[in-house]
Amino acid sequence: MMSTDQHIQQNMNDNSNNSNNSNNNNTNNNNNNQSVNVNVNNTNNNTQTISNLSAGLKSVSLTDQQQNEVNLNLLQQQLHQEASTQQQQSRITQFFQNQPTEGFTLFSHRSAPNGFKVAIILSELNLPFNTFFLDFNNGEQRTPEFVTINPNARVPALIDHYNDNTSIWESGAITLYLVSKYLKENGECSLWSNNLIEQSQISSWLFFQTSGHAPMIGQALHFRYFHSCPVPSAVERYTDEVRRVYGVIEMALAERREALIMDLDVENAAAYSAGTTPLSQSRFFDHPVWLVGDRTTVADLSFVPWNNVVDRIGINLKVEFPEVYKWTKHMMQRPAVKRALRGD
């Protein structure tokens, strides 16, 4: 199965990175047998070429004029594409020629939830970073420079300028790299753990998010909005799978909430256990709960960007998965999450 970002990002039009010089064939003039020659050798004479071709159109027959107008439009499109490609290649080439010596560079895209997932982790850890938003329409993700740091030509990818410009790709791998590095350098990391058992629990949810949660939402979005022709069965299949995934998370959070209420609301614990008083009446019913332990970890935060777009496939978290909704709402209120989602 393709990676999640591919299903969202490949629906954008990729243009080729390199343009070859083009030659337009001569068109004979019926009256004076003159020809309009188009020979594009380099960017500097392209403007004159278009002017000559436009002038020549005035003296040819209607049929030839129509053909030359088509040729002119194609040439203009090619020149525009060539100029855009040169500009984008220059942008990414300049970055790699003058890389920072400190901090991190995150390669992302404005519509890539996995890129924002990494941005959230960087922001939560208060690590200095800059985001380089790639332009997929101009093929920046396929440039030799970028493929060097991510052979899969997808986002996200991260460069650690503190560590000899080490590059890491895939959002899960980047997340583990960041929290492990932070733990090693600072002795503790609130988003991770010193405890091996907790580390395994956090990793389980992190891998569940990267292998089940994100890909299913990505596929549902793809078949709902971007596929070349309607496939209702695919939309239904992936949307149902997203609901199944959220059912797993909802159950885990509900169990965490019940344990929290029974622990903190001691005077009413017996009534809750007997079922005479519903848990929803507890003053702790809206208290934050987390997937692992009593604090926010990367296990929780990795879900945020995708939870933020799931309404686009017709899933209402507040109605269908209330615990997931409250959990997401608490995380969305965190300053670091707000900064990351804004693209700061």
From Swiss-Prot:
Range of residues in the leader sequence: none
Domain spans labelled GST C-terminal: 195-344
Any Pfam family matching the protein: GST_C
PROSITE patterns: GST_CTER, GST_NTER
One example of a Gene Ontology biological process annotation: regulation of nitrogen utilization
Chain segments carrying region Disordered: 1-49
Biased composition (Low complexity): 9-49
Domain of life according to the entry: Eukaryota
Gene3D superfamilies recorded: 1.20.1050.10, Glutaredoxin
Family according to the record: Belongs to the GST superfamily.
Subunit structure: Homodimer.
Its biological purpose: Plays an important role in the cellular response to the nitrogen source. URE2 gene plays a major part in the repression of GLN1 and GDH2 genes by glutamine, and is required for the inactivation of glutamine synthetase. URE2 gene product may catalytically inactivate GLN3 in response to an increase in the intracellular concentration of glutamine.
Name used for this protein in its record: Protein URE2
Naturally occurring in which organism (per UniProt): Candida albicans (strain SC5314 / ATCC MYA-2876) (Yeast)
